[in-house]
A protein has these predicted regions:
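The feature captures the beta-strand-to-loop junction immediately N-terminal to the Walker
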Residues: 55-57
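Helix-to-loop junction immediately C-terminal to a conserved catalytic motif
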Residues: 70
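Conserved ABC ATPase signature
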Residues: 148-152, 156
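Conserved ABC transporter NBD signature motif
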Residues: 7, 20, 78-90, 131
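Conserved ABC ATPase "signature" region
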Residues: 115, 119, 126-144, 196
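A short, flexible loop at the N-terminus of ABC-type nucleotide-binding domains that lies
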Residues: 15-22, 28-41
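A short, proline-enriched helix->beta-strand linker immediately N-terminal to the Walker B motif
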Residues: 167-171
Length: 268
């Protein structure tokens, strides 16, 4: 079991530095079988610049949580605030959402897909492409700007999708299982890539994943949700300094203990 000192690398989230806040949030849906409550009484805080991982069973409301943050939904009860933005319309201006699928447009090249985020903000296509272009070299995609999505590997497509998420410059990113569709080797490579990308472009991040090891490697803190309706069962602080190395993390005993703890909570 981690000592208090080992588990306290990340400072507690104070009100003054909170970037994301959910208080008593409940969200339900009407289905043919009646009402389904996705999350109920959900409370979470995320500090400015913190990466929060969220894990939990399938159907526990993880994607609903991200859609609430990104302003794609409103809660039935409770409050959701992102950098002070309390309404869905306001949250859409400060939170960028990356869904599970890359959703690249097949008729646009990679640069055009990344630049689409800027075009949607009113920039002319040429200017948007000029602003997006420098990221391709930084993110290991130099010489692939003109490639269509069908010519890109799964990892490359996810990098383009991440650039599209990053380019609007919003302070908060909501990432919904960005590597779920990738094979194991590519997924491991992309975990290291994302860790490096977030080190170079720090943002407040809420990352949903089914992979406990992925959550621990990428996050400063991990929230474990219950089965539906989703509630926070535990919050685990990750005592791993940045920058992070995926190969070293595999051998880290503190992370191994945290993984066991997370799995215990999920199995309870």
């Amino acid at each position: 079991m981690l000592t208090k000192a080992e588990a306290s690398v990340t400072e507690p989230v104070s009100v003054s530095e909170t970037s994301v806040s959910l208080s008593g949030v409940t969200r339900a849906y009407r289905t043919k079988r009646g009402q389904t409550v996705a999350v109920e009484g959900l409370d979470l805080r995320v500090a400015e610049g913190e990466v929060l991982g969220v894990v939990g069973p399938s159907g526990c409301g993880k994607s609903t949580l991200l859609e609430l943050l990104a302003g794609l939904q409103e809660p039935d009860h409770g409050t959701v605030e992102v950098v002070g933005a309390a309404t869905a319309e306001e949250r859409r201006k400060v939170c960028s959402y990356m869904p599970q699928r890359d959703l690249l447009l097949p008729w646009r090249d990679a640069l055009g897909n990344a630049a689409l985020a800027l075009e949607s903000q009113g920039l002319a296509r040429r200017e948007a492409r000029e602003r997006a272009a420098p990221l391709f070299e930084r993110f290991g995609l130099a010489d692939f700007e003109r490639s269509r999505p069908r010519a890109l590997s799964g990892g490359m497509r996810q990098r383009v999708a991440f650039m599209r998420t990053l380019l609007p410059g919003r302070p908060v990113l909501a990432l919904d299982e960005p590597f779920a569709s990738l094979d194991a080797i590519t997924r491991t490579d992309m975990q290291q890539w994302l860790a490096d990308a977030l080190a170079a472009e720090p943002r407040t991040v809420v990352l949903v994943t089914h992979d406990v090891e992925e959550a621990l490697f990428l996050s400063d803190r991990v929230a474990v949700l219950s089965a539906r309706p989703g509630r926070v069962l535990a919050e685990l602080e990750v005592p791993l300094p940045r920058p992070r190395d995926r190969r070293a993390a595999v051998r880290d005993l503190d992370l191994a203990r945290l993984r066991e703890r997370a799995l215990e909570v999920l199995g309870s």
